[in-house]
């Protein structure tokens, strides 16, 4: 009797598995995306699936997995040989993936980002720092790294790293718990203190991982961190809601702009933007970053991947994703539409704001040529990675 029951249990289990797999899509009909959390409007997926059917006659289902930090891409593609069709790495990670042959070339017969007028020329220049031939990546969102400050606390405009690192803001300084961002801020600050003839260009600063530079950055950060607040994720919300002791914070422009406008916190609660918050790319220099989409080395559905890249570059889709992510697309038509929208102030965002606040916000989201000229692009660390990681371990424990 027990044997009969066991056989019946096995049959039921097998039938259950068959039924389960019968409802699964074939891998070649799935487009697998690996992206940061809350960075793409998933409402566009059904629209893409219909559009792809119209374009090719083929069916596809978009499936998404989210990562917490861009380094996960390296681990999963290089180490685990994950078969994601599309991944969303930042600039320096694109450079690394290209060097290790971990991404595939984009099919330029489907989408060619070098085509005249598709991408804003300034951001094509940014891309050439990590994808010189524009063969492996399609730009998604850009931004800068600088300083967010609460004018109601500082009572003065903050414009430099010298001010950010000064003792004036001891106990009121927020440092992003990100090795690359904190290191960049310290290196730009330290470079500005060198004699004029020995200073590096801003791009050279982002390529310097010498022992001497790492040690100097460690000393700067060690002093700063002894009287700073760590920003793991929520300082922007705390500052916007008046709950933080921070007056100045190392911040990405997209996060700064997000909490200046009407926004939702991580729990979905809506808040009015804080018009006492200001943002700057410091006079000594900053970072311009680009997040991209690439086709992974072990991708299966490369045709759908290329068509999805083309889809992302359509104006309406790029605008939707910009509005969802709180960042700005470098796709020219989307960029121009968003710029015109903010300049027209159709929703009254800039009513009753301080003199210069509108101009500051526009500059935050749409940096001028002068601002971009004092920004460098983060690079793959070819030498010095172990020393940099050791420095960070010593600092954060």
What residue spans do the PLM features occupy?
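Short, low-complexity disordered leader/linker segments with a strong preference
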Residues: 1-31
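Early extracytoplasmic/lumenal segment of secretory-pathway proteins
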Residues: 25-100
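Hinge/lid segment of periplasmic solute-binding proteins
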Residues: 59, 65-74, 91-144, 155-162
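Short loop->beta-strand "edge-of-pocket" segments that line small-molecule binding or catalytic clefts
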Residues: 163-181
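Ligand-binding pocket segment of bilobal, Venus flytrap-like solute-binding proteins
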Residues: 175, 182-186, 194-278
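Conserved C-terminal helix/tail region of periplasmic/extracytoplasmic solute-binding proteins
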Residues: 358-397
């Amino acid at each position: 009797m027990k044997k009969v029951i066991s056989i019946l249990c096995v049959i039921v289990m097998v039938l259950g598995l068959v039924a389960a797999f019968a409802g699964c899509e074939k891998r070649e009909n799935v487009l697998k995306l690996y992206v940061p959390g809350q960075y793409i409007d998933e409402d566009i997926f059904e629209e893409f699936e219909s559009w792809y059917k119209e374009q090719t006659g083929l069916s596809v289902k978009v499936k998404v997995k989210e990562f917490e930090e861009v380094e996960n891409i390296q681990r999963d593609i290089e180490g685990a040989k994950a078969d994601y069709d599309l991944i969303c790495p930042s600039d320096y990670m694109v450079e690394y993936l290209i060097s290790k042959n971990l991404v595939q070339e984009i099919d330029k017969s489907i989408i060619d980002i070098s085509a005249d007028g598709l991408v804003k020329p300034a951001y094509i220049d940014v891309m050439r720092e990590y994808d010189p031939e524009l063969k492996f990546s399609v730009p998604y969102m850009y931004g800068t790294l600088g300083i967010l400050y609460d004018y109601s606390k500082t009572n003065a405009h903050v414009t430099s790293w010298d001010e950010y690192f000064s003792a004036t803001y001891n106990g009121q300084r927020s440092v992003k718990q990100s090795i690359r961002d904190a290191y960049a801020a310290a290196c730009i600050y330290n470079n500005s203190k060198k004699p004029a003839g020995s200073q590096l260009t801003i791009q050279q600063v982002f390529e310097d991982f010498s022992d001497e530079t790492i040690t100097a950055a460690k000393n700067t950060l060690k002093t700063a961190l002894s009287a700073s607040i760590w920003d793991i994720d929520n300082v922007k919300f705390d500052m916007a809601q008046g709950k933080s002791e921070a007056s100045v914070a190392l911040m990405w422009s997209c996060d700064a702009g997000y909490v200046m406008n009407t926004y939702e916190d991580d729990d979905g609660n809506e808040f009015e933007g804080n018009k006492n918050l200001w943002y700057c790319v410091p006079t000594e220099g900053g970072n311009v970053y680009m997040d991209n989409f690439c086709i992974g080395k072990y991708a299966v559905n490369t045709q759908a991947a290329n068509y999805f890249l083309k889809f992302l570059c359509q104006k309406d889709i790029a605008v939707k994703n910009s509005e969802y992510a709180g960042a700005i697309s470098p796709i020219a038509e989307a960029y121009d539409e968003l710029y015109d929208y903010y300049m027209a102030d159709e929703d009254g965002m800039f009513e009753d704001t301080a003199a210069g606040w509108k101009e500051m916000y526009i500059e935050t989201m749409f940096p001028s040529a002068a601002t971009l000229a004092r920004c460098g692009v983060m690079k793959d660390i070819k030498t010095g990675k172990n020393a940099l990681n050791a420095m960070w371990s010593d600092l954060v424990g």
